[in-house]
A protein has these predicted regions:
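Short amphipathic alpha-helical "recognition" segments used for binding
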Residues: 26, 69, 215, 540-543
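Short glycine-rich substrate-engagement loop in P-loop NTPases that contacts/grips substrate
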Residues: 295-314
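Acidic/glycine-enriched edge-of-secondary-structure segments
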Residues: 84-87, 92-103, 225, 296-301, ...
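Short N-terminal secondary-structure initiator segments
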Residues: 1-36, 183, 312-319, 365, ...
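Conserved helicase motor core of SF1/SF2 NTP-dependent helicases
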Residues: 203-209, 213, 220-294, 312-313, ...
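Intrinsically disordered, low-complexity regions enriched in Ser/Pro/Gly/Gln/His and often acidic
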Residues: 94, 165, 331, 375-376
Length: 599
């Protein structure tokens, strides 16, 4: 018998029971496949939740989407009017699952596909229409305009042992594939069935009384804000684990920044407790929205309108499994409509709903309350954290002075305290340098970066280079790799990839960039390069911060980006050494010159 994840017994205990079609398919697979096949039911894959994923070691993967639709109903007709305006074509849905596995979820797959398009065939797709007649399938196939090479349409009558064996053979799922090696198999396995986290994998970290109070999970709605480095993400991670222990259910953790999910994953990994990783759904809001829309066959017709449509999920609200705990990081980047959508459709009644943020990092100019706090859908006071564990005292002073200089009439200013054991360990003087460049000179910046790295004897893993512009990051990365022969960790495409994919269209370039962000991790042992906004939430020991001419001047950012908050966010990523290169931006020159003179 095939191996089921979760077990068939536990599948029938889920809060949202399998549909009639799903149950029929699961029983068929149980009766007709041996134990070389693994069956994953509604696995959470970075927001995607395909009905069934079938995998066989050394062979490949098959995604099976189940539809219990009545083809005689309003959303379908033989006159080429298959679906309502809001209902998504199931072919689009299943192809979205497949494309996301290549483009987002499994890092190596995208580059394998780009180098060898044949790799795309290791994942095949099947749509099982439980209530469709043979005639319905035939009409559907003749009307649609899709390449059918990797999709099979079947109904209950064609779901036989003989025919399904033919499908497995056609899709190479019953024999050895030279492309689906052990490394790929293990990569898929980690996403489909995340492993157990043991107590020994965690770390012992001392918490302050306020932090100990805030990591306690309880069914309430709460807002937590704090200065840079005050442990907001640490609290979120420990509260997430405690929430899972309290409810015995899955926890949804939402971010704004694509790559921040990996930072939160690292923080949860530090918790000394035992849990399975599949109990934590960590994802950024936009990917979550798109994935849930796809999971319920909903069309996104206009991203600007649908993302703020507070009734978007109304037609499927009774199908959506609710989370007893939802934790949202970077809430200063959220629109109020997003928060309302999450609470309305995804939070269980009397559920735990906790928001974490810092209005000083409001780089997207979201609306604030009259008292200059972040606008949310939770009433009551904020829980505040004012001690920083990240920043050296001198870096904290720069952040404080920056607030006084640029945020005086915009926000309530922070009084940043340094946590006692942080100060105790900081008995050396951090390094600060400031350069003003009258023109863009990447060779000059590169040579100075290398000179400082050598002088301070810095390990590559402790170094981050951030800029307001992607192009600058690409150029510096190229110089580091070509002239220093060093590997790097990039949050965007390389210069070579940019030149290659620009010729092929921006879609492929965006796919590569998103793949880099989704698979960015902090400890590869190499120098990290990123734009400031993509590094938001992360931290680094030694930071080279590159400030360029006001972005609106050349139109590379839209006017919804606030440069003051962006630069402040960049500064507060730094834990110890800070080196700033300012290219032509007079706005910040006087401030940083004063800092350098007083250092």
């Amino acid at each position: 018998m095939a191996i089921f994840f979760p077990s068939l017994e536990n599948i029938y205990k889920l809060s949202v029971k399998p549909t009639e079609g799903e149950e029929h398919l699961l029983n068929f697979l149980k009766d007709n496949l041996d134990d070389t096949y693994e069956i994953y039911f509604q696995s959470f894959i970075n927001g995607d939740r395909p009905d069934v994923v079938l995998m066989r070691r050394d062979s490949g993967v098959m995604i099976i989407e189940v539809k219990d639709w009545d083809f005689s109903s309003d959303f379908y007709s033989g006159e080429n009017k298959y679906f309502s305006k809001s209902k998504k074509n199931p072919l689009d849905q299943v192809f979205s699952y497949k494309n996301n596995l290549f483009n987002l979820h499994i890092k190596t797959l995208l580059y394998m596909k780009l180098n060898n398009p044949t790799i795309f065939n290791i994942i095949s797709c099947v749509i099982y229409f439980h209530n469709a007649k043979k005639r319905d399938i035939q009409i559907f196939e003749t009307k649609r305009n899709y390449n059918t090479k990797n999709v099979e349409l079947i109904n209950r009558d064609s779901l036989t042992s003989e025919y399904f064996s033919k499908i497995l053979s056609d899709k190479w799922l019953n024999r050895k594939s030279k492309y689906f090696d052990e490394t790929l198999y293990e990569s898929f396995k980690r996403y489909l069935q995340p492993p157990l986290h043991t107590i020994e994998q965690g770390s012992i970290i001392d918490l302050l009384p306020k932090q100990k109070e805030l990591i306690n999970s309880r069914p309430t709605q709460q807002k937590i804000k704090g200065v840079a480095g005050s442990g907001k993400t640490l609290i979120l991670a420990r509260r997430a684990v405690n929430a899972h222990k309290r409810t015995k259910n899955k926890v949804l953790i939402l971010t704004f920044n694509v790559s921040l999910k990996n930072y939160i994953h690292n923080k949860i990994n530090e918790v000394r407790d035992e849990f399975y990783w599949d109990n934590f759904h960590i994802i950024n809001f936009h990917q979550f929205f798109k994935a849930e829309a796809n999971n319920y066959s909903l069309k996104i017709r206009n991203i600007n309108e649908d993302y703020i449509n507070e009734s978007f999920f109304e037609d499927c609200k009774h199908k959506i499994p609710k989370y007893e705990t939802i934790l949202i990081d970077e809430v200063q980047d959220y629109k109020i409509e997003w928060l309302n959508i999450i609470k309305k459709y995804f939070l269980a009644e009397n559920g735990e709903f906790v928001l974490f943020g810092d209005e000083k990092q409001n780089i997207y100019k979201r609306d604030l309350e009259k008292n200059k706090n972040i606008r949310t859908n939770i009433v009551g006071r904020w829980n505040e954290l004012n001690e920083s564990f990240r920043l050296h005292t001198k870096i904290a002073n720069i952040a404080t002075n920056f607030q006084k200089y640029f945020f005086l009439d915009k926000y309530e200013l922070d009084k940043i305290k340094i946590a006692y054991y942080q100060t105790f360990n900081d008995d050396t003087n951090p390094h600060f340098e400031y350069y003003f460049l009258p023109s863009n000179n990447m060779e000059y910046i590169f040579s100075n970066i290398i000179e400082i790295i050598i002088k301070l004897k810095l390990h590559p893993n402790d170094i981050g280079i951030l800029s307001t512009k992607t192009e600058t990051i690409r150029d510096l990365d190229f110089l580091i790799r070509s002239e220093r022969n060093e590997k790097t960790e990039m949050m965007c495409e390389t210069k070579e990839e940019s030149e290659s994919f620009t010729e092929k269209g921006t879609d492929k370039l965006n796919i590569v960039r998103r793949n880099k962000k989704s698979n960015f991790w902090m400890n590869p042992g190499t120098i990290k390069l990123s734009t400031i906004h993509s590094f938001k939430g992360w931290e680094i020991h030694t930071l080279f911060l590159i400030i360029e001419e006001y972005p609106e001047k050349e139109g590379f950012y839209d006017k919804k980006i606030s440069l003051d908050e962006l630069i402040y966010t960049g500064i507060t990523r730094c834990k110890y050494n800070l080196i700033i290169f300012n290219i032509e931006n007079i706005q910040y020159d006087m401030f940083f010159k004063t800092i350098a003179q007083k250092w």
